[in-house]
Every structure is written in C-alpha cells, then in structure tokens.
Amino acid sequence: MKRARTVVLLVAAAVAGCGEPERPADANSRPPVLLRIGHVGHDHHLALYVAALEGERFLKDGGIGLKEVKAKEVYDLLEDGRAVARLRLLKVGGGSRMPAAMSRGEIDVGLGGTMPVAKFADGGQPFKIICPLQTDGDMLVMQKDSPVADWAGFVAAARSADKPLRIGYKAPVAVAKLVFEGALKAERIPYALDASDGDTRVVLVNFGSEKSPLPMMEIRAIDGFVMNQPGVAVAVDKGLGKVVAELRDLPPRGKWVNHPCCCVAATTDTLAKHAGPVKALLKVLLLSTQLIQQDQALAISCASRWTKYGLAVEKASIPTIGYVAEPTDTWMAGMATWAERVREVKLFTGKYADASPQQFVDDVCDLALCRAAAAELRAAGKLK
C-alpha cells in the first residue's frame, strides 16, 4: 500500500510538472544578468546586428560572442564558455526615444544619437556615453529634378530663389540638423522655422523623428531634407531624391569630418552594478566593428538581413558611414566640436549650459570600460 501511494505521488508530481518550462540541469548555465538593450533598427547600429547574426563566428574565433535564443530579440552573451549575461534587444525608436526609454527604466543600455543622450544628461538623467558606434552618414538630399547638384549650387539657389527653400529635418537635436544649421551660419544664409521674416532664405521643416520625409518629398511639400542613412539611400532608391552633399563636407571646412553620430550609452546604475557584463558587451561590439571594417560585403549582407532593406539600399548606405567603436582622438575632438555647436544654439539649459567643451566631454563620457575592453582584446591578439 505504501509502495502504491508512492507511485501515485510520483505520477501526480509528474503530471503537475507537465506545464513547467524545462529547467537546465546546471543552474550555473543560466546567464546571471539580464541586460535590456535599446536600439533603433537601422544600419547605424550595425555593430550590434553583425554581432547577433555572426555570433557563432565570434565564439569560434575569439571565445566571446552572442548565442541566439530568440532571433532578433534574445541572446546569451558568452565569454570563454561562460554565460555572463542575457541580452534582450528592444527596438525603441530614434531621436530622443532611446534616452527617453532609458529614463523610464525600460532599458539598461541604449544605442542612439550622441546629442539626444547628452540632452537628457544635461537635464539631470544619470546617463553616460560609454562607446562610439559610428560617424558621418548624414546627407543633404534634394528633389530629383532640382537644378542643385552640389553644395555650391545649393548656396546659390538659396540666395537667388524667389521664395525660401524648404528643407526637412527629423528632430530638433538630430545630428544632421545641427551640422546643416552650422553650415548655413558659415555661409551667412538666414534660416528659420517659418518664413515670417522676409530675409529668411531657408525654412527648416520638422517631419518627425519616426516619420519618413518621403511623403513630403512626393507631394513637394519640401524641396529637400537633411538626414542620416539609410533614409537617404531609401529616398534615392525610390526615385524621390538625389544626394547633393555629404554633410561631413560642409563648411566650415573640415569641421564636420568624422562627426560623432550614434553611440552606446548606459545608466550609471547599470555601470556600477554590471561593469563586467557591460565590458563583455563592448568587447563584442569592438570585434563586430572590426569585422565590418574588414569585410564590407558581409556588413552589407548583415544590414539587409536585419533591417529588411534591399541590398541596393544598403550598398549605397554602408560605405558612407564610418563604423568606429573606440574613442579615437578624432572622435574625442568631434565630441568637443558638438559641445561648441550646441552652445551656439543654446541646446543645453541644465548642468552643461555653462560647461566648457572639455568639461562637457569629461562629464558625459565614461569610456573606461571601452578602453579596458579594447586593451584586453589586443593583449589576447583579437583586436588590431
């Protein structure tokens, strides 16, 4: 009778457990830390997507990489055979949406624009830029049948046109807008957000950070737009515009070359609690950036696979973007240039309002983990 009761209890326990998820035999096999990673979904964040799509390559070659759990959503970050974190990738939107999501506690680490991150930090949010992602990749696009063919032609048209040129931009703190305004100022071309001033030669039109400028181009509500890739390549591919200038080449001469665009940012709480896993993540991004630099064809293929844009779009987009994951002297100088530029337009109204460029860079950036990650990879012969 006792034996029968034991059998019944075992069967009951088995039945009760039928709906339970399978548990790993070794509790240590589960990643100890969950990091929620916010991203936008376009090719400025290609380092993350290459890391995800080519995870097995990195694990085989370098002993560190991402193992897919759920495609495009969940990955285990492995280093030397040990799971150091589980990454949950969340598409949070561009412009100010990424730092806004971080401020609400929805993500721990975010990929997005340097200036939106800095603007939130200026307002008191405990955010730090911990790693570059890329530079450049911003363009001036005009209507396909516009007589404007280059920057000199744009300047001439702005000065001589019967009415102000209408140029779209995606967000007040968008990198492309800040560069474009700087170039207009250098050329002494009056611009404004409306045409109420008779001296205005360029009217800036906000088409929204999550909207495409293409509908406005199609109905000719704007004469052109300034924007980052791959939106530019999409417009050209659809026959709704032509590139007349890369913003890196605009005046003042040399000022915008290799300008910082997107970065990796994190909360100070995340950095304090999870420095090891974050450093491991940065190692993966450093290695994937190196692969992008070495194999552009692979980079284009990965971009198309992740973003779902056609190969033609990514073939036009990727070569115009500078992928960089280390804070080089050029990148640091570019951050100081941003500090000067945003001071001119009074973008900062909080703790950076009166900061010098060096004070701004020193406070908004915490690059210790990135530099440590790069040093460890080089010591192991994995990073050139």
Residue ranges, per PLM feature:
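Secondary-structure end/capping motifs
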Residues: 272-350
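Paired acidic/hydrophobic, glycine-rich loop segments that form the ligand-binding mouth/hinge
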Residues: 91, 99, 108-113, 128-129, ...
